[in-house]
Regions:
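Acidic, Mg2+-coordinating phosphoryl-transfer loop and its flanking beta/alpha structural elements
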Residues: 115-151
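Alpha-helical substrate-recognition element adjacent to the catalytic core
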Residues: 5-89, 94
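Short catalytic/ligand-binding loop motif for oxyanion handling, primarily in non-cytosolic enzymes
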Residues: 15-18, 70-74, 105-109, 124-127, ...
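Flexible, charged surface loops at secondary-structure boundaries
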Residues: 1-2, 55-57, 109-113
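Conserved beta-strand termini and adjacent loop/short-helix elements that scaffold enzyme active sites
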Residues: 64, 99-102, 135
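Donor nucleotide-activated moiety binding/catalytic core segment of transferases
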Residues: 94-115
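Short beta->alpha connector loops
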Residues: 45, 100-104, 122
Length: 151
């Protein structure tokens, strides 16, 4: 049986980075704190409960997210740390994480036979080589379909 993988973006998908006051100015100033300050876009108790059920059905949970557009080795390290800490703080049960250079084609990062991408970026979803879930809509409904085997 092929492994089933659910791949999540972070910013604008599960973390409300764009809701942090001054987020863009901060990132342009090589300040990673907006990644730490971002609030979840969903009730995380419900979200994480659904992910645990999905995992119990044999799915792997992968986070694939871009680093900031502005980049230095030290800043990239701070962004990686902030994103990992955000996932830990909110208890997201992931199996694998890929924090990659801004603009990296996400369809080249994970290579599983059956994988579903959850992302807010239409261009990224269009380049994906499998099923996608539009994170601009309520993803909880789509995740419940996976839980009930209706996906």
């Amino acid at each position: 049986m092929n492994e089933k993988v659910l791949v999540f973006d972070m910013d604008g998908t599960i973390a409300n980075l764009y809701g942090v006051d001054g987020w863009l100015e901060s990132l342009r100033a090589y300040d990673s704190s907006p990644y730490e300050k971002a609030m979840p876009l969903y009730d995380m108790d419900m979200f994480n409960s659904i992910l645990h059920i999905i995992k119990s059905k044999g799915w792997r949970i992968v986070v694939t997210s871009w680093l900031s557009k502005g980049s230095t080795p030290i800043y990239d390290k701070a962004v990686r740390k902030a994103k990992r800490e955000w996932l830990k703080k909110w208890g997201v049960p992931y199996d694998e994480i890929h924090l990659v250079k801004y603009g990296t084609p996400k369809h080249r990062v994970t290579k599983y036979p059956f994988q579903v991408l959850v992302d807010d970026n239409e261009e990224v979803r269009n380049a994906w080589h499998g099923r996608t879930i539009d994170a601009n809509k309520n993803i909880i409904h789509e995740l419940i379909k996976i839980v009930t085997d209706e996906f």
